[in-house]
Amino acid sequence: MGAGASAEEKHSRELEKKLKEDADKDARTVKLLLLGAGESGKSTIVKQMKIIHQDGYSVEECLEFIAIIYGNTLQSMIAIVKAMNTLNIQFGDPARQDDARKLMHLADTIDEGSMPKEMSDIIGRLWKDTGIQACFDRASEYQLNDSAGYYLNDLDRLVIPGYVPTEQDVLRSRVKTTGIIETQFGLKDLNFRMFDVGGQRSERKKWIHCFEGVTCIIFIAALSAYDMVLVEDDEVNRMHESLHLFNSICNHRYFATTSIVLFLNKKDVFTEKIKKAHLSICFPDYDGPNTYEDAGNYIKTQFLELNMRRDVKEIYSHMTCATDTENVKFVFDAVTDIIIKENLKDCGLF
């Protein structure tokens, strides 16, 4: 009888210990939801978490991105060539018209994600054409990946035999996120579970079941989207869509007590773009200087003023460049400190 009781007590103690360990783990688990409109840079932030907190990409993993990189490069050139027609731009050299036809034919016949020499030669010749460059300069008037210039300028390196993508090549690669992707990592004695949710309109209905128990939302908006339209609706300005989405999330009853951090992303692209395209394209009331600081601060204010609970809920904002590992590391460190501070406040310790 005594032996049975002590076995029960032992089991009970073990169970209590396990429950306490689970409770401690739950208390240290941070559930992060990455939200934002399509192509704002959410998936790039996830890749950075792998680089910063999970030992990065192995050579084998980098090699798996070759097909995506080649696919992105080809699709970018096809998009530019098609836009030449739409925007009525002529090739600098009439011989490139024939290259453009060959490119379209080859694209239909090659294996997806491959880059035969004939194709890379054609893409290289097209990229040097003055008409193609003029069309590239008007990229906000059609849909073109942000990485287009990066890959096309580096095409010779990408097609060298034995090519292994660099971390920067991997970060710049683009695959539309469908569904929900979870990444786990540890930092400052916390267990992070980060959820990247597809941003395009058709994906948003999948968000709802991620809402419960979220510690922090990182909302990502592309600063450079101010003169662009949506992939899924060419009547809607991307910045307006992002503001509309942020409004619905930041004032949602689900998130009344959730920390919200705003990443105003693609500051590198924005820096170059703001020199050429005035912010009044997106915000007709804006008559301030068309500089990175002034225009950037104006955009930030448009987001922060949507917060209807400003008196009790602070929204933290950062200008970010998701492809810059040091910048993301610095900003994410600050976000982690915010999460720790908010958690201590909830426990009455701050």
UniProtKB/Swiss-Prot annotation:
Q: Where is the signal peptide?
A: none
Supply one GO BP term: detection of light stimulus involved in visual perception
Q: Cite the residue spans of the region called G1 motif.
A: 31-44
Q: Where do the record's region annotations for G5 motif lie? A: 320-325
> Domain G-alpha, which positions?
28-350
Origin: domain of life: Eukaryota
> What CDD domains does the database record attribute to this sequence?
G-alpha
Query: Could you tell me which residues are lipidated, with the kind given as N-myristoyl glycine?
Result: G2
Transmembrane portions of the chain: none
- Report keywords, A-Z: GTP-binding, Lipoprotein, Magnesium, Metal-binding, Myristate, Nucleotide-binding, Sensory transduction, Transducer, Vision
Annotated Mg(2+) binding lies at S43, T177
Q: Which residue stretches belong to region G4 motif?
A: 261-268
Q: One MF term from GO for this chain?
A: GTPase activity
Entry keyword Transmembrane = no
Q: Note the InterPro entries from the entry.
A: Gprotein_alpha_I (IPR001408), Gprotein_alpha_su (IPR001019), GproteinA_insert (IPR011025), P-loop_NTPase (IPR027417)
Cellular component GO terms held in the UniProt record: cytoplasm; heterotrimeric G-protein complex; membrane
Instruction: Give the span(s) annotated as Disordered.
Output: 1-21
Composition bias, kind Basic and acidic residues: at what positions? 7-21
Residues given in the record as GTP binding sites: 36-43, 171-177, 196-200, 265-268, 322
From the UniProt entry, list the residue stretches annotated as the region G2 motif: 169-177
Has UniProt tagged this entry with the keyword Coiled coil?
A: no
Q: Where is this region: G3 motif?
A: 192-201
* Annotated family: Belongs to the G-alpha family. G(i/o/t/z) subfamily.
User: Assembly state and interactors?
Assistant: G proteins are composed of 3 units; alpha, beta and gamma. The alpha chain contains the guanine nucleotide binding site.
| Role | Guanine nucleotide-binding proteins (G proteins) are involved as modulators or transducers in various transmembrane signaling systems. Transducin is an amplifier and one of the transducers of a visual impulse that performs the coupling between rhodopsin and cGMP-phosphodiesterase.
Entry protein name:
Guanine nucleotide-binding protein G(t) subunit alpha
